[in-house]
């Protein structure tokens, strides 16, 4: 699988009736999409991102480290305590698929 970027994921974890953001970094990912406009759909679909994270290029990849609503930031970023700590553009996971069949095993993420 071709890769063109890296990704930081902030996964929301509940601990003792409180939430914390667990940070996961993946060096080899395929990123497509981003902020912009479309002549047909306006800002609706133009803000979507599609991300594929190959298992063979990310040895610590675990499907359980992702959830709907988690935060996606392109590139490598530091730990956070809240969403307000994020500098720049970020997306939330809206769809999540674990594609483990065939020769091209990967996690496919949709974000908005």
Question: What positions do the PLM features span?
Answer:
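Active-site-proximal polar cores
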Residues: 1-26
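Short, conserved turn/kink motifs that form compact alpha/beta structural patches or helix kinks used as
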Residues: 20-112
């Amino acid at each position: 699988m071709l890769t063109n970027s890296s990704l930081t994921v902030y996964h929301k974890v509940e601990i003792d009736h409180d939430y914390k953001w667990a940070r996961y970094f993946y060096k080899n990912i395929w990123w497509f999409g981003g902020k912009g406009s479309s002549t047909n759909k306006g800002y609706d679909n133009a803000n979507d991102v599609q991300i594929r994270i190959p298992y063979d290029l990310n040895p610590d990849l675990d499907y359980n480290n992702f959830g709907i609503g988690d935060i996606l930031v392109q590139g490598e970023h530091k730990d956070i305590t809240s969403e307000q700590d994020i500098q720049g553009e970020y997306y939330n996971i809206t769809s999540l698929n674990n594609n483990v069949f065939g020769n091209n095993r990967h996690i496919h993420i949709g974000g908005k």
